């Protein structure tokens, strides 16, 4: 049995959590707290890195104290302390990294520097039915849209990706276009509930292959964003009031269609019977319902991260750290820094005596 304190400050959510992993692989979230900066950044239409870093410094100490007290543990009783160290906003990442390394050194605990995307992949382990590899992961968030095959030995292979905007980024930009505010995902979902998703025909962006045809698993959302812009411009020439509900529903539907169709095709083509969906956009109701229904029709078992752990949180970072501890991974060097970008398939390099950054 292992227990960890986990910290997350990669973007605009300050978070801390304490988790415990049982011998049979079950993970208990003993305490989890998040301090969101959404309202403050909404004034600017997006995340302001300097503001995010300052708010993390203010919020994180109180969050750590709260989760440790709620979990009924002391830092000295934990097996390790974990923090996100890549990818993300460099200044924001430093807050969790420095805090985690300092606490680990003071209490003589191992430190685990976790890849943020590995945390998202581990978030499905916080549900009722932990997944056993092999399975295909659709990671769909504000910064990433990727299809990742997780092998039985834990190895990860990327089979599909977005070549421009991530799905979550497209939601934010279209929400801004429609005057719906930030963050875009929840704003569009709320307005789309009463809309006609078939009113506007929008493109399902595809990526051309050099020899002809299209890549079956890759994504492109920039063309969809442009199509929405042109549709709105045309409507404004003919009406004083935009049909916001229909526009939002049509956009939301085409994003869901693209993600579901290409993900399930990828799983079927690779003979994978399990598909896991994680990331902030995985909280979207239309996408969740469509993925579950169509997966069932095609005989592919679909698991989705619990709603509470779809968006950025520390529990998912703790889950990833616990899985590393279960694999007897080495700890992260106290000399390690942070990196705004780092490939997920090189996450093992974070657990070596010589840090990659």
Swiss-Prot record:
Keywords: Acyltransferase, Cytoplasm, Iron, Metal-binding, Transferase, tRNA processing
EC numbers on record: 2.3.1.234
Main location: cytoplasm
Record note on cofactor: Binds 1 Fe(2+) ion per subunit.
CDD domains: ASKHA_NBD_TsaD_bac
Domain of life: Bacteria
GO MF terms, alphabetically ordered: iron ion binding; N(6)-L-threonylcarbamoyladenine synthase activity
Binding site residues for Fe cation: 116, 120, 312
Binding residues for substrate: 139-143, 172, 185, 284
The species this protein was found in: Synechococcus sp. (strain CC9605)
Catalytic activity from the UniProt record: L-threonylcarbamoyladenylate + adenosine(37) in tRNA = N(6)-L-threonylcarbamoyladenosine(37) in tRNA + AMP + H(+)
Purpose of the protein: Required for the formation of a threonylcarbamoyl group on adenosine at position 37 (t(6)A37) in tRNAs that read codons beginning with adenine. Is involved in the transfer of the threonylcarbamoyl moiety of threonylcarbamoyl-AMP (TC-AMP) to the N6 group of A37, together with TsaE and TsaB. TsaD likely plays a direct catalytic role in this reaction.
SUPFAM superfamilies, sorted: Actin-like ATPase domain (SSF53067)
UniProt KW Cytoplasm keyword: yes
Protein name: tRNA N6-adenosine threonylcarbamoyltransferase
Uppermost EC category: transferase
Subcellular localization, as worded in the UniProt entry: Cytoplasm
GO BP field: tRNA threonylcarbamoyladenosine modification
PROSITE patterns: GLYCOPROTEASE (PS01016)
Names of required cofactors: Fe(2+)
Keyword Protein transport applies: no
Similarity comment: Belongs to the KAE1 / TsaD family.
GO CC terms, sorted: cytoplasm
InterPro entries hit by this protein: ATPase_NBD (IPR043129), Gcp-like_dom (IPR000905), KAE1/TsaD (IPR017861), Peptidase_M22_CS (IPR017860), TsaD (IPR022450)
């Amino acid at each position: 049995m292992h227990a960890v304190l986990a910290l997350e400050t990669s973007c605009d959510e300050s978070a801390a959590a304490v988790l415990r992993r049982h011998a049979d692989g079950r993970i208990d979230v003993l305490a989890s707290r998040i301090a969101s900066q959404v309202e403050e950044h909404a004034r600017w239409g997006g995340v302001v890195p300097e503001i995010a870093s300052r708010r993390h410094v203010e919020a994180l100490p109180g969050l750590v104290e709260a989760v440790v007290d709620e979990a009924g543990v002391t830092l000295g009783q934990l097996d390790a302390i974990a923090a996100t160290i890549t990818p993300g906003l460099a200044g924001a990442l430093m807050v969790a990294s420095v805090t985690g390394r300092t606490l680990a050194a003071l209490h003589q605990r191992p430190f685990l520097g976790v890849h943020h995307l590995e945390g998202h992949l581990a978030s499905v382990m916080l549900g009722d039915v932990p997944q056993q590899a092999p399975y295909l992961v659709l990671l769909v968030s504000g910064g990433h849209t990727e299809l990742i095959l997780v092998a039985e030995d834990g190895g990860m292979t990327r089979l599909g990706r977005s070549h421009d905007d991530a799905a979550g980024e497209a939601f934010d930009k279209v929400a801004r276009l429609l005057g719906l505010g930030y963050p875009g995902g929840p704003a569009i979902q709320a307005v789309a509930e009463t809309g006609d998703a078939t009113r506007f025909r929008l493109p399902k962006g595809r990526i051309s292959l050099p020899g002809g045809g299209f890549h079956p698993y890759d994504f492109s959302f920039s063309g969809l964003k442009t199509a929405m812009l042109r549709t709105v411009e045309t409507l404004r020439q003919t009406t004083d009031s935009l049909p916001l509900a229909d526009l939002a529903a049509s956009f939301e539907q085409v994003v869901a269609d693209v993600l579901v169709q290409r993900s399930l095709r990828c799983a079927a083509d690779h003979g994978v019977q399990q598909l896991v969906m994680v990331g902030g956009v995985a909280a979207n109701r239309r996408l969740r319902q469509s993925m579950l229904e169509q997966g069932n029709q095609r005989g592919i078992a679909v698991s989705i991260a619990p709603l509470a752990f779809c968006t950025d949180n520390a529990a998912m970072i703790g889950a990833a750290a616990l899985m590393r501890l279960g694999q007897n991974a080495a700890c992260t060097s106290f000399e390690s820094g942070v990196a705004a970008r780092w490939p997920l398939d090189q996450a093992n390099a974070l657990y070596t005596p010589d840090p990659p950054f």
